[in-house]
Amino acid sequence: PLNADQKERAKAMLNRMRDVFAVNAQDLGCTNAVEHEIRLTDESPFKETTRRVPPRQLDEFKVALQDLLNSGVIKESKSPFASPVVLVRKKDNTLRVCVDFRKLNSKTIKDSYPIPRVADTLQALSGAKLFCTLDLQSGYLQVKVSEKDQPKTAMTTPFGLYQFTRMPFGLTNAPATFQRLMEYCLRDLNYKTCVVYMDDVVVFARNFDEMLVRLQEVFSRLCQYGLKLKPAKCQLFQTRIRCLGHVVSAEGIEPDPDKTAPLREWLNSPPKSAKELQTFLGFAGYYRSFVKNFSKIAEPLRRLLVSGPDKKRKQHPRPSFTWTNECQRAFETLISRLTSSPILGYPNFELPFILHIDASGEGLGAALYQTNNDKLHVIAYGSRALTTAERNYSAYRREFLALKWGITEKFRDYLYGTKCYVVTDSNPLTYLVSSAKLSPSDHRWLSALAPFDFTITYRKGKSHGDAD
């Protein structure tokens, strides 16, 4: 918590920067930095049927449309295009006007602008002790749609045809346009004083004074480009925040318990089809770096989706869906691990890393650590299943594969340019670099490892359980 002096200084700064905050839902910013364009594979228009609106929602829908008109988000249209409206309830029970843009999206040339990796975004917060999360007031609606492309956004309603002047949700390239906007606005501040992931902006600092300066910098930049924040959604001067499905603090990163809580509900109703299992594994996989040996645990479940380790669906049709006791144990173990995950530490690239590796007959395991204040902190876990060919490797070659995969693939971003101590329970692996008896493929793997600075040490298998 802030002391009395800090509160006064924070209030004074917020008062100076009050123009960055929207005063109500209709108080939208309008950026001059980018416009959203819609390039189509062919310009031939289409017209979809107006969908029926339940009579009880008609009056509410009309009010919502009028609000959009008053805000300048939409205007009446004579467009030859027409996409149907979909009405959705918000969390506060008010009506959101959405549009089914699937037909338009199918004709849209995709924008390849990259969206940041979640892991990179979170790791940029290393060393920070204070955080502020900023949320834009209907962020997409602060971006203009190019005038020539506005007719393509036309929506058909019981009250007529309207087109968007601002970028609506549902357009296939809207996320790319918004990420481009935010990175342009905060270009020299991104990853230095704040991180940007779509409409999530996190300002981070080591102390209050630094935060005050950084926050004002970000506010000034948003004002410069005509963007406004939603005050109720902004969290300022926090020591612990929720960000991208995780909880972030000075101690490290952990899964957001509110996000993983639904996993417990799955215990009462295990997946009954391949589709349900894919949904579960997709959700669980988002947090796989928190689970030691995720791939090995999930292997019985993965086998239900593919007939073999290699996904050759044409040669090997999908097996029948039979939920065995082995599947149930794997399912329960994953849920238990995900709902009691460790806090992962932030990497410090000024310190060496410690990499524990191991290989079994089914998969590879790796655990990345660093020592800080005489304590060993987990940075990340990694694992993957072996292919059919890899399962035929000798034990030594599987360990060599685990070394190459762990350093040159899984944790490359951490280990390139930093010292790494590799711990293995394979004694022959410790003689790898000096051995004269290497096959041509061994030499290729060794060449891939050459740019990395690592030392291999041996530890007996009984005390080597963390990478298994």
Model-predicted regions and their roles:
Residues 1-113, 194-198, 205, 245, ...:
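Reverse-transcribing Pol proteins
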Residues 4-25, 49-80, 112-125, 130, ...:
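Inter-domain linker/hinge segments that demarcate the starts of reverse transcriptase
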Residues 17, 37-38, 68, 85, ...:
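Mobile genetic element proteins and their domesticated derivatives, centered on retroelements
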Residues 19-49, 57, 88-96, 113, ...:
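Reverse-transcriptase-like RNA-dependent polymerase core
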Residues 88-96, 104-111, 141-144, 182, ...:
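Catalytic palm subdomain of template-directed nucleic-acid polymerases
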Residues 105, 160-177, 268, 318-319, ...:
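A short, polar/acidic, helix/strand-boundary loop motif
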Residues 192, 197, 223, 232-351:
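C-terminal reverse transcriptase regions that engage the nucleic-acid substrate
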Residues 279, 285, 392-468:
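RNase H-like nuclease module associated with reverse transcription
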